[in-house]
Amino acid sequence: MSEHLLLAPLLESYFRRRLTKQRNATPATMASYRDALRMLILFAATRLRKKPAALVLEELDRDLILAFLDELEEKRNNTIATRNARLAAIRSFFHHVAAADPASFGVAQRVLTIPIKRAHIEVTHHLTKAEVDALIEAPNPRTPRGRRDRTFLLFLARTGARVSEATGVNANDLQLERSHPQVLLRGKGRRDRVIPIPQDLARALTALLAEHGIANHEPRPIFVGARNERLTRFGATHIVRRAVAQAVTIRPTLAQKPISPHIFRHYLPHPTMSGTENASV
């Protein structure tokens, strides 16, 4: 192993070369991995009583990283999923270390043997058709906000889109004038796919675009908040919770389920969820 191999050059080459150029990582992935490694380095610096810039690779050994992961769970109250996400970033970095400096393969290999922690399997809740219909019909169709909420809920139910995909749709991602309308969803990790949409959703989207004066070819968001800016994840969650509060009097079973935008992905059947991969986008 290279003696006293400083972390700084390896970290720089990792983000500049491996993630950006080789892996074409998304900004979200870059930010997540950067946060994980920053937290690890600060933990190591505190534990070893050294400045972060003075840390060397061999000090980030298996035992130190296991202690870091334990602290995430025990002191920071991170979930197992978050702990595993941090470990994924660390393992990615050490894969780069092994390739960039073969002399450090041993220390990298020992870190790479740290296993992903298995989480308890939680019960997946599903919505019935009656519950979904009650949620979609809950918003007031006589108000602009109500019409937007209805269309957004209908979009989630008919496409099975992730909330980030639904809020990220622009008018020019829609093809509503085709005999078989469809939408381009921009997924995680640059995985885009084309999803067919039914006629009821196509009509609702057409009406929403017309109400806001948005042309089909414009790269403008179709779902916007009170300030006419793209709907956020928080805003999407608020729409769903507001619909639940209104619909629960009709469908009391809704009160027994943890409902968020994600639950619409478990509304079965969803023949459109897989979609068609669009590698050229």
UniProtKB/Swiss-Prot annotation:
User: What InterPro entries does this protein's entry cite?
Assistant: CB, DNA_brk_join_enz, Integrase-like_cat_sf, Integrase_catalytic, Integrase_recombinase_N, Integrase_SAM-like_N, Tyrosine_recombinase_XerCD
The residues covered by the Tyr recombinase domain are: 122-281
The processes (GO biological process) annotated in the record are:
DNA integration; DNA recombination; establishment of integrated proviral latency; symbiont entry into host cell; viral genome integration into host DNA
Active-site residue numbers: 162, 188, 262, 265
Q: Where is the Core-binding (CB) domain?
A: 5-98
Annotated keywords: DNA integration, DNA recombination, DNA-binding, Plasmid, Transposable element, Viral genome integration, Virus entry into host cell
Q: Name one GO molecular function term.
A: DNA binding
PROSITE patterns reported in the protein's UniProt record: CB, TYR_RECOMBINASE
Functional description taken from the UniProt entry:
Seems to be non-functional.
Protein family = Belongs to the 'phage' integrase family.
Return the protein name: Putative integrase/recombinase y4rD
Organism of provenance: Sinorhizobium fredii (strain NBRC 101917 / NGR234)
Q: Upper taxonomic classification of the species?
A: Bacteria, Pseudomonadati, Pseudomonadota, Alphaproteobacteria, Hyphomicrobiales
